Every structure is written in C-alpha cells, then in structure tokens.
Amino acid sequence: MSKTSCFLKKYRLILLWCILGIAYILFWTHRISKAFASVSSTSDSTVHLFERGNTLNDSNDQILLTCNDIKNITPANQCRFAKAYCKGEASGFFDYVEFYFCTINSLRFPVLSIIVGWLIFLFITIGISASDFFSTNLVTISWLLQLPDSVVGVTFLALGNGSPDILSTFAAVRVNSGGMAIGELLGSAFFIVAIVAGSVCLIKPFKIPRRHFLRDVAFLTGTILLVIMFVLHDGSLSIWQSLVMILYYLLYVLFVFFSGSSGVSVVITDENYLPVSLPVYSPVLNSFDDSDSYSSTDSELSEEAFLLPAQASRKTQKIHYINDNDPSNSYSSYQHSHVHDFIHKNNTHSNRVLSQSSGPIVRPSLLAALDFRSSNEEQHPGLRSLDPLNIQDGDLTMHPMHIRHSQSDFYPSGINTPVSGINYPNLGFSANNSVQSLVSEIFRHPTHTDEDFPLPSPSLSSLLFPTLRNFAKKSWYEKLMDVLAVPSVLIFTLALPVYQCPRLAVDPIYHMDVSNCNPSKPTWSRKLRLLQCVFVPFAFVTFSITGGNRLYIYAASSVFSILCITALYYYTDEEKPPKFLPWVSFIGFVLGIIWISTIANEVVGILRALGVIFNLNESILGLTVFAAGNSLSDLIADIMIARSGFPEMAMGGVFGGPTLNILIGIGISSFYSSISNHGNDSVIEIPHSLSITAYFLLACLLLLLIYVPLNRFRVNRVLGLLLFILYIVGTSTNIVVELLKDK
C-alpha cells in the first residue's frame, strides 16, 4: 500500500471535515456577498446595510414611488401599480402583493386568508425541516467525523438549532429588509424567553439545574447588553464591535467546552430500550428535598434531562456520572472501572463508552414531541401525574402491566421503540440516593438482545406518513397537528434524504468503525431510497439552479435519477442496508440548507406583502409575526414535552439558541459588510420598536436571574405568569408606538 493511500486512509475523516468546512464557508461567502452587494451604497461614506425607505430626487423634487405608496392609489389602479412598483417585494416563487391587489375587492379577504394560512403552514414546515431532518443529518455527520460531543453541541447542533433564524435573517437582508432581520432576531429571543419558557413554567413547576441555567442566561444577558451598547446606542457597527460580538460567542463556546469537563457520560445502546416514562431522563430521578442543598448528583442528572430523547440517538440511553475528582462524590475509580468493563462486555453495539457531554442541545422536534406524548400516555397512564417536585422517598416498581405489547414503526425523527414484557427491578428512589447505586442496580439485571425482540421491516406507508401512526388514539389537538404536518413530512421524506445514526458518545481513546453506524436495524427501505432518487435531484435543480434552459436542466436531472435508480436496484440488497447509507446525510445536509433557505425566502416574501397590505413597519413584522412563526414549532414541542411530565427537557434549549442567532446573525453580517466596503461602519436604521423589545427582553432575563436563585432554582407558575405579562406589555407597547407614529 502506497504512502499516499495510507495517509488518505488515516486522515480521511479530517480531510472530509476540512472539505465540508471549506464548502460551507464558500457557500455562505457567496450568499452574504450577494446580499450585501444589493444593499451597499457607494454614494455615502458609510455602509447603509439595513437602511431602507423613501428618498427624494433632488434634481426634480419628485418623490420616488415605492410599493408602500400603493395605499394612496385608487383601488381600480392598484393592480397596475403593484405590477409596476412591487416586483421587488417578491423574494420567493410567488408575488403575493400582485396576487392580492389584482383580485377583485369582494374576493380579497379569502385571498388574504389563503396567504395567512400558507404562511402558518410554511412556519410549521421550516420548523419540521430543521428539527426532524436537518439536525438529524448533522448529528450523523458529526458521528461520522468522530467529533466530541462538546464540539458537536456548539457547532453542528448550534447550526441546526439556529438554521431557521439565521437563514431567515439572511433572506431578509438579501432583499433590503434589514429592519425585519434584526427584528426577527430580537423578537425570536423575546418570544422564546418569555412565551416558550413561560409556558413551560405554567404547565408544571420543576427544579432547574443551576449550572446550565446561570451559564446560558448570563451569556444571553451579556449578548443583549452588547446589542444595546453597540447597535441601539448609535445605530452603527464598526469592525471592532462586530469582532467583539463574534469573539463573545467564541468565548461562550470555550466556556461550554471546558465547563463540560466536570462530568462523564456513559452511553448504552440497547435495541430493546424501554422508555418507561424515560427512565434515565425521568423527573423521578430528579427528586429533590426541600433543603437548601443542591448536590452535584442532582445537578448532573437534571442537566442530562435537558436532552429530548427523540433527538438523541435512536434507542440510545445516556447515563451521566459524577466527576471522579469531586471530593463530595463517592464514585470511586474502582466503580468507574467496573462500569466501564461492564459496558464493554455486555454492549456489542458500542465500543466507545465514556465521554464528556455538554453544550447546546438539538432543537426540540415537533413530530417527536407529539408522538412521544401520545405513546408515553398510552403505555404508562399511571405515571402521568408524577410531579418532579413531589416524588416521595420509597420504591418505584415497574410492572409488566404498565407496558403494552406494541412495537413502533420506524419514525424519521428517531422515536425510540418500546418493547413489552420487561420487568424492571424494584428501585428505591430518594433524595439521598447516589447515582452509582441506582446505576449498579440497573446493571445488575441482564440486557436483551436483538433476537429476543425482532422488529418488523418498516412499510413504505409508515415511512411516508409517520405522523398518522396510532392516529385514532390521539387527542384532537394532536390529530390536528399530525394532519398539518403530513404534507411537510411527506415532501421532506421524499426530497430530503436523512439517516439517523446511533449517536454514541465520542471518546478519542476508542476506535470507531463506521460500519457500526448501521447495525442490523430495520431503518433501510430500498423502495423509499428509489423514490428519493427521483425527487431529490428534482428538488435540487428546482431550488438551487437559476437561469439556463430549464428543459435541459430537468432532462439532465432525469438521466441522473435513472442512473441512481439502476445502481441502487442492482447493487443493493432488499433487506440489508448498504455500508454507504450513513453518508447520504451529507446530501441531506446540502438539501436541508436549500430547503430551509427556500422556505425562508417565501416567508420573507409573504411578510413583506403583509406589510404592504396593512401598511405595517417591517421591524414590527419581524418582532412579532416573523419571530413567533419561526419559534412556533419550538413552542408546540416544548408544551407537549412539559405536559408529558418532563419540563426539564422542554426548558433545555431555551436560552442557548438566541445567543448564537443574535451574535452570529448581527456580528458576522456587519463584519463582512464592513470588510467588503473598505472598513466603513455599518449603519443600521433603528426604529423605536427594536429598542423597546431589547429592553423588555433584558427585563425578562434579569427577572430570571433574580427570581430563580431566590426561589432555590425552582421555577413555578408565578414566574411563568410574570414572563407572559412582560411579553404582552412589551408587544403592546410596540404596536401602540407603531400606530401613533403615523398620526
């Protein structure tokens, strides 16, 4: 074997990572350069990156008409005016302004209802694409590249979490709607902190892990202070200010990375994982007494509850152990070694066990939350009333009668499949129990192999329509959400390839074989992949290639599809998944960016049209409709999870995501703009609504930093009500200011 081949084999993953990073940088450089090329002004010494409005022609004192002037045009001439002056408002495939104003007056309300309904559907779709498809591929890619969990959390998963907000922001900037872009970032953070977190608090009081809470809320507070000092103070951003925002996020990344070294994770991959009300993540494991003490054991376990099981690896349990170096913990090196050896001897699916786990988690999955809630209540009705704060000391026995004999069909978001007939041991839970005693009790019982509970091969219909599984047994609102999600899931299943690899904790000590990414699991459907060979190329050329002869482009796409179908049909087995299957996640990564960008462009086009129709400021639309819409799936998913009895999970990703979105969305955009324009400052038009939102968001964060520690890190309905009041008052103030502005 030559030295070159040995080198490529040894460093292939590093090379792939470098290629992926270069491609990603080039892609965004191209997108950002196009965006700022259209908004940069060479007639002024400063770069008016986000400024937009009516100007006067000094030569003849005539007002330059814009689309917003359509309100001054008679209804009979509004259609012609829209065709002449509103073409720039259409950022997507459809011109919604023309669609509305070229409709007769008697039908404009139904047309407006169609536009609003389409907007709601797009918001749901962009949330599903990010959480259930795009983020899943990112997790698989990180597994293939052997990246540590802490690095994955602040890179790949951060990208997946913030993809709708970041891509929507760039889509708004590209069409000169900077006010909408900044408004979306601040409004989304305000909505998530006040409404999403407040909803979780209202549903079920619980105790929150102090370390993650203080870290994330403190850094988000610092982010808002930077925005107030740099952006809202004088309406401009210099290069050094942009660099400070970027470096501040890097500081957050480093802090997350190094603060994660206080714990050790053990990952157990079990084909017969039994989600008995989520054993590892269950609030039963997080019972606290009323004392002031908040042990590291409780903290670490509760912090692990921040992971949504459907977004972790399929049928993978993570158990978080206490730091060996912590003198307050009695977890000896002997016990550590014993557990380590046990996993290696009994778990044939994982040869990498120990890892440090920290950092931001994947955004909550809307589909997973819906399915998880219905499955959890169906299988364990007796556990619905468990309160995270009021678990009494004593024994908890799981009897076989609590478990129904059912096996879930394969679900794209990775819902774990329950099994039946497993009698869990009688486990004693108390506030004084140590983690190692609990884990030792669990490990004392034998595990089950794949042969004990073979899973049937998934049918094509179950793969194409997973939200309709157990449809008759769901509540009315779950049925409504499932029906609304059917078109989106069907489209993405056909045109966005995804592979959910078992997410094993990464430790550089152990070697990982990529073939372990597809252990004999029934996640392979050749029929589905054959259909994807048709729809994936079609979606790629439709949404990514502009210009040229469309007939030739689609003909080339058809030829490529035929070649892929032929190769897949003759060189793959009907039952056994091919070894290259995990690598389709790279294709899904590219298609995910294309899909989310396309949907974001369409959303921006609709919002701009609504601004013209109702004569609303773009910043108000960004702060309210745009922000709430992009966070809609998060709100629904977190409410479902909290109502299922796991509010810790629902609260997990509330504070980390906005930090990334604001710092990267504003910092990198303004920095690149300044560099491209000879170091000039970026001037940003700041309406009063942006300042009002920023200060109310800061008030919410200060309330959390004061109230939660004083309440011994318990969040309750009083806190949720206060957050709701702040959001209602802040939003109402913005609307009143906007209405009074034109009077």
Curated annotation (Swiss-Prot):
The chain crosses the membrane at residues 13-33, 109-129, 138-158, 182-202, 213-233, 239-258, 528-548, 551-571, 580-600, 609-629, 649-669, 690-710, 718-738. The keyword Transmembrane helix applies. The keyword Cell membrane does not apply. Keywords: Endoplasmic reticulum, Ion transport, Membrane, Transmembrane, Transmembrane helix, Transport. It is found in: Endoplasmic reticulum membrane. Pfam families: Na_Ca_ex. PANTHER family: MITOCHONDRIAL SODIUM_CALCIUM EXCHANGER PROTEIN, NA+/CA2+ K+ INDEPENDENT EXCHANGER. Belongs to the Ca(2+):cation antiporter (CaCA) (TC 2.A.19) family. It is a multi-pass membrane protein. GO terms for molecular function: monoatomic cation transmembrane transporter activity. Putative cation exchanger. This is Putative cation exchanger C3A12.06c. One of its GO terms (biological process) is monoatomic cation transport. One of its GO terms (cellular component) is membrane.
